[in-house]
Amino acid sequence: MRHWKAATAGALLLAGCSNASVDQPTATKSVEASAEPQGDNILHITWGGIAEADQGEARRHWSTWTINLVDGGPEYGWLSEKGAAFPHTLNFELAGTGKVRAVALDNRFAPVVREDGSMSQTAEGSPVRRFALLGSTVGPDGPFETLVAGEAKADARTLIKLPKEASARWLRLRIDSNWKGGGATRLSDLAVFGELDQRGSAGEADVSGVYAHEYGPIALRQSGQDLRGCYNNGLGTLRGTVFGRILRLAWFSKEEGSIGSATLVAANGKLYGFWYRPEDKMGSPWNAVRETTLTDADLGACRAALYPPA
């Protein structure tokens, strides 16, 4: 988290923490706007949508993780392992029960240059071809029913409307083939259009706790809708708000002289989401697993950020 001016911190927190608008991510809009179905992309991270890690994801670079499919843009995406056999199964969860009307798969290869000069994606992998979207209102393990099946265009965005509106909270994308006929499969973005019963529903009772992340722990303290936090053992601080299970945060590191924003979703004892710098054209995943409570943790350098003097 580097290179940003502190003067924009307040603007970040007020404007939100995604690289797209809250109501409708601009990156998911079709070239033919009239072709868009009625409703919002309710799978987008700013609507509380999450993506579960696929089998074997921990062995891959984060730029290929499933969470990248809910950020609203094609800059980062998902990439399967080379030797994985079809079908590939990717699991998602909405913030509440949704009325699903359409799905859009984005197979465009649209990498951007990262701050270290590398590209956000490699040309490895063949685009998704045949697929099915399944849904459940019962739980993450189903039972699932097929909502729609179809064929995604290679290197393009494909929007397919459901035969009829369907209710679902847990979604499963089954990928049956790619355009090469084998090898690694890639997908840049997934959008699910419809309406949620309650956008702010399904929130954690309290997101306070210490969450384990590979670069260092994330400590959060919730008081009403207000959030205070600390990351990487005191390297930086967090301030923000919570709405249902959606966390909108600004982060600041005095040591690094940097500032930015984050959009996270607290669900299933985990944090899902991204941190951003304003010059970024995409966010970087900031997924973490709840490890302990604040009471049971040695907060060390984070204590002052979590419990500031009155």
Protein language model annotation of sequence segments:
Residues 18-20:
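Bacterial signal peptide processing site
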Residues 31-43, 194-208, 294-309:
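Low-complexity, Pro/Thr/Ser/Gly/Ala-rich linker/spacer regions in secreted
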Residues 70-144, 154-202:
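Aromatic, loop-rich ligand-recognition surfaces of beta-strand-rich domains
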Residues 200-284, 300-309:
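Central antiparallel beta-sheet cores of small beta-barrel/beta-sandwich binding domains
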Residues 1-7:
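Bacterial N-terminal signal peptides that target proteins for export
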Residues 33-70:
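Predominantly extracellular/luminal regions of secreted and cell-surface proteins
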Residues 109, 137-140, 179, 196, ...:
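Solvent-exposed strand-loop boundary residues in beta-sheet-rich modules
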Residues 7-16:
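Bacterial N-terminal signal peptides
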